[in-house]
Amino acid sequence: MTRYCAATRCKNRGGQAAVIQRKVSFYPFPLHDRGRLQEWLRNMKQYKLYPTKHQVLCSDHFTADSFNIRWGIQYLKPNAIPTLFSFTEKIQDIAELELTIKEGTQDGVKVDTDTVPSQDFCPNVTNNLSHGFDTDEYVDPDDKQVYLKNTIDGITVSQNKTKDLYVPNSEYEIQPHLITPSKFRQTSVENMIVSSVADLNSQSNQVYFELQTDQNYVAENVDTFQVDHFSDVQKETFPLSLVKQTKQMDAEKDSVITIIVPGGQDGSAISDNLQFTSSEKLGFENDANSTNEILESEHSYCRQITDRHYLRQKIAKLQSKIAVLEAQENATLSRLRLLESVIAKLKQENLLSDEKLKILENCGSSVDIVIV
């Protein structure tokens, strides 16, 4: 694995041709010596760094008296401490940062010098953000206007002056208007979109439900609206829950609910085309039964294709084999019993022969005594 120097602003790494020519070597941190490790980190100005056994420092950060050369190999002394570190680039970065802060103040943007800017300033663009509705229609003129102001830490609220909100890396500007939730009512559900429709002549205690299709808009003056079923683009049928108006809404001019129905069909054709017939129900039941049969045939040990007569013959053969094995087992058991009886008889005969030998020896000794 390639070794990299853990010091900041140091670009030495193992395997470089320049490193090989200069004979730069790498040494691990003294993890076993805590005091020496703290001195290393203090000289590196890395107080929060806790190195691992894989992190190393190159020989450029040590003085010449920190090494012992034996047999042409450069060894680091056990008490060596790195002292050669360069922090000039960091000072240059700070100078560049101060220069950018001064340039920002010259352009008319005030920047706090104590904090580091993390956003890029963009020019003032007069394009409005569009969210699918006009904000002026939903702003209450009686409410107090709240304005947004851009700072370096975030967005602050101001009630005295009007400031432009600068969005980093964007082409839009948010105008100083605030949408109040008291006048804006919008209902959004899956497959249902609520939008605003301008120039409506509504009466009191009436609600306009607009059925929006891909081609036209149909507005109806009704108290309740019911949708039984609807179909999607692929002509697949599935039920939809009933949408009912259970209570009368406030008599306001902007209370409009728009429902988008896919497929480009009228409201009357929605419920007529989507009634399940008995044949369709039977078709669904047959499909379910066929799937169950397929699962049974796949996961059963006996396939449905085989015949019962063949299975009975196979069972009879297995039973005959079992009977033969039982007979062989009985025969082997009888043979074992016979062998046990023979062994017992031989043991008895052996005992008898031993007794006969002893008797003969006694007789022979008695005859010898008589002869003497």
UniProtKB/Swiss-Prot annotation:
Under SUPFAM superfamilies, the record lists:
Glucocorticoid receptor-like (DNA-binding domain)
Question: Per the database entry, which stretches of residues form a coiled coil?
Answer: 306-362
Give start-end positions of each zinc finger (THAP-type).
1-85
Its GO CC terms?
Answer: nucleus
> What is the superkingdom listed in this entry's lineage?
Eukaryota
Any idea which GO molecular function terms this record carries? DNA binding; zinc ion binding
Q: Does the keyword Repeat apply?
A: no
Subcellular localization, as worded in the UniProt entry = Nucleus
Q: List keywords of the entry alphabetically.
A: Coiled coil, DNA-binding, Metal-binding, Nucleus, Zinc, Zinc-finger
Keyword Nucleotidyltransferase belongs to the record: no
Could you tell me which PANTHER family the record lists for this protein? AGAP005574-PA, THAP DOMAIN-CONTAINING PROTEIN 5
Indicate what this protein is called per its UniProt record.
Answer: THAP domain-containing protein 5
The UniProt gene name for this protein comes to thap5
